[in-house]
Curated annotation (Swiss-Prot):
GO terms for molecular function: proton-transporting ATP synthase activity, rotational mechanism; proton-transporting ATPase activity, rotational mechanism. Belongs to the ATPase B chain family. GO terms for cellular component: plasma membrane; proton-transporting ATP synthase complex. This is ATP synthase subunit b. Coiled coil: none annotated. F-type ATPases have 2 components, F(1) - the catalytic core - and F(0) - the membrane proton channel. F(1) has five subunits: alpha(3), beta(3), gamma(1), delta(1), epsilon(1). F(0) has three main subunits: a(1), b(2) and c(10-14). The alpha and beta chains form an alternating ring which encloses part of the gamma chain. F(1) is attached to F(0) by a central stalk formed by the gamma and epsilon chains, while a peripheral stalk is formed by the delta and b chains. CDD domains: ATP-synt_Fo_b. Keywords: ATP synthesis, Cell membrane, CF(0), Hydrogen ion transport, Ion transport, Membrane, Transmembrane, Transmembrane helix, Transport. It is a single-pass membrane protein. F(1)F(0) ATP synthase produces ATP from ADP in the presence of a proton or sodium gradient. F-type ATPases consist of two structural domains, F(1) containing the extramembraneous catalytic core and F(0) containing the membrane proton channel, linked together by a central stalk and a peripheral stalk. During catalysis, ATP synthesis in the catalytic domain of F(1) is coupled via a rotary mechanism of the central stalk subunits to proton translocation. Component of the F(0) channel, it forms part of the peripheral stalk, linking F(1) to F(0). It comes from the Bacteria. The chain crosses the membrane at residues 25-45.
Amino acid sequence: MLELGIFSSNTQNIGQSISERFAGIFPSWPIMLATLVSFTILLVVLTKLIYKPVKKMMKNRRDFIQNNIDESTKQVEKSNELLEKSNIEILDAKIKANTIIKDAQILAEEIKNNSIKDAKDKSKQLLEETKIYIRQQKVLFAKESKKEIVEIAGEMTKKILSESDVKLEDSKFLENLLKNDITK
């Protein structure tokens, strides 16, 4: 039984110990009220001294970042517009350059054709002048040939006449006849 008595006193001690501990967990009302008031004061002070300045600083920083983002967006849009404008100007310049090249090629072709035409005209003119010169030389050669033939014929006639007894008048007649034939 003694054992039972020890067991029951231990149980009572344990029950009291647990009750004391639970009673120690809950503070007294005045301490709890003082803690609550001091926590509220601390919360108000921290809000005024730390939270509001930190919140204001964060808002300023957020506004600064947003302004930078907006500015960057505007700059990107502006640079895209300038890029598009420069691409259009480059395209216009290429079109103008191609037009200038085509015009230059057409002009060069015209100059080439005119030069070829002028050269052909000059060669035709030179050919005509050469033909005229050749005709003149032929006529001159024919006249000179006839003249030489007449002279040779005259000399031969004189020889023949001198060997024969034909009169001098007949020889003059032959010379006149040959000379008239040459002048025609």
